[in-house]
């Protein structure tokens, strides 16, 4: 369930993938610290959240992952090319994140255009 998307993000983002997971778990009312370490508390919280909302945890992680990438693009102009193509379409980061999400949670082209219009 979450193994593939967390690993996929970890390849490029390192411990930020775990921090995104931990922030997602907080949205599921898990009492956890965002420290970027997969320890026993993160594992237990992930298992609990998965039991409570098995159909939503992966999608929620994907949404948080997209938000992380867009925030990174906002803050660091040299990384914008990974979030949005020159033509204004979804870049590799966004496509990879959405690959693990159900389509109904993908950003629509119009919402993506609005969200990234200021990126230049």
Language-model features: locations:
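Short acidic, glycine/serine/threonine-rich helix-capping segments at coil-helix boundaries
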Residues: 2-60
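Low-complexity, Gly/Ser/Thr/Pro-rich intrinsically disordered linker/tail segments
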Residues: 52-120
């Amino acid at each position: 369930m979450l193994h593939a998307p967390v690993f996929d993000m970890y390849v490029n983002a390192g411990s930020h993938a775990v921090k995104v997971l931990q922030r997602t778990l907080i949205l599921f009312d898990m009492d956890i610290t965002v420290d970027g370490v997969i320890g026993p508390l993160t594992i237990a919280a992930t298992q609990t959240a998965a039991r409570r909302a098995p159909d939503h945890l992966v999608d929620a992680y994907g949404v948080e992952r997209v938000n992380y990438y867009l925030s990174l693009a906002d803050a660091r102009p040299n990384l914008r090319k990974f979030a949005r193509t020159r033509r204004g379409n979804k870049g590799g980061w966004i496509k990879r994140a959405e690959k693990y999400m159900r389509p109904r949670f993908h950003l629509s082209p119009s919402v993506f255009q609005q969200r990234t219009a200021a990126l230049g």
